UniProtKB/Swiss-Prot annotation:
Taxonomic placement: Bacteria, Bacillati, Bacillota, Bacilli, Lactobacillales
Gene name of the encoded protein: engB
The protein's name: Probable GTP-binding protein EngB
Gene source species: Streptococcus thermophilus (strain ATCC BAA-250 / LMG 18311)
Signal peptide: none
The UniProt record lists the keyword Cell membrane: no
Function noted in UniProt: Necessary for normal cell division and for the maintenance of normal septation.
GO molecular function, one term: metal ion binding
Domain EngB-type G: 28-199
Family: Belongs to the TRAFAC class TrmE-Era-EngA-EngB-Septin-like GTPase superfamily. EngB GTPase family.
GO cellular component: cytosol
InterPro entries, per the entry: G_ENGB_dom, GTP-bd, GTP-bd_ribosome_bio_YsxC, P-loop_NTPase, Small_GTP-bd
């Protein structure tokens, strides 16, 4: 069964932005959180999966997402875009505030079914990437690691880069790892199939 048969992915809209749990939607729709460092390609990932060009705003300015952005998908599912981490030009105080907001959502939100943790296929995971993965494993939150920007690397080198990332993350072989490109749409079907299997 494809995602199109399960839900109309094009029927999507940004629902609300929230700073804390009092602002979260009050229902039982399943949620998929998307986490990753600034400019890893989260907005492009969302837009590609939902078949929309500008639903999630892509920005040349890292650290632009400062709230939890909830996207309603066909009234059956929500994506939750969490603030990009690891951006140096944000104050320590602001980063700490974001960290608390993200942690509160990830640890306390009953609607959360899985976290899509995005990393850049071209580079080794940063310390922030590693800490995010360790955090999710510690709290036993289901995680899918998606390595973005695959189109920037020759296809023949994908396996090598995947191995490097998995080693640095101390990757759990029971988790899913998907190589993805918003340009070529590589990984599109696998991403949807894996997400839907977690709901």
């Amino acid at each position: 069964m494809t995602e199109e048969q399960v839900l109309n992915t094009h029927n999507a809209e940004i629902l609300l932005s929230a700073a804390n749990k009092s602002h979260y939607p009050q229902d039982d729709l399943p949620e998929v959180a998307l986490a990753g460092r600034s400019n890893v390609g989260k907005s492009s990932f969302i837009n590609t999966l939902l078949g929309r060009k500008n639903l999630a705003r892509t920005s040349g300015k890292p650290g632009k997402t400062q709230l939890l952005n909830f996207y309603n998908i066909d009234d059956k599912l929500r994506f939750v875009d969490v603030p990009g981490y690891g951006y140096a030009r944000v104050s320590k105080k602001e980063r700490a505030k974001w960290g608390k907001m993200i942690e509160e959502y990830l640890v306390t939100r009953d609607n959360l079914r899985v976290v899509v943790s995005l990393v850049d296929l071209r580079h080794e995971p940063t310390q922030d990437d590693i800490q995010m993965y360790e955090f999710l494993k510690y709290y036993e939150i289901p995680v899918i690691v998606v390595a973005t920007k695959a189109d920037k690397i020759p296809r023949g080198k994908w396996n090598k880069h995947e191995s490097i990332i998995k080693k640095k993350l101390n990757f759990d072989k029971n988790d899913h790892f998907i190589v993805f490109s918003s340009v070529t749409r590589d990984g599109y079907d696998e991403a949807w199939d894996t997400i839907l299997a977690e709901l």
